[in-house]
């Protein structure tokens, strides 16, 4: 990891800087997320690959949790000096790991309290919801991104299928 990347990550760990970037780019400058509502989250996510059952490590640049009105959501700022043409898939990996981490925590809580869903195959009770995971990609290059911004940009669809699928878009800054 280069010195520039470390400096960027260090700056973004300041909650006031993080909240300013989120507010300007996600909420049009409105002060929706305050520094006081943010808490740091570990950037390392461990996930098990379905294909070979091996553990994998994912490293998010600067993740934080925002607690607002007794509800939480996760925000992650990803630094990109070089344009990455698979960024939507990388982001899906981060989000998948973060959602699976939440499911694991809820299931563990259910096990401890005996609050099992019925039927057990549901895994979570109907009233149990996950917290959203939102990633903003900060483009530090001198040029426009010009790479895929959503999964659909990376896919080659048979005729008439593309418009049927939901776009999973990156929030690119």
Where in the sequence are the language-model features?
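Accessory alpha/beta interaction modules
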Residues: 1-172
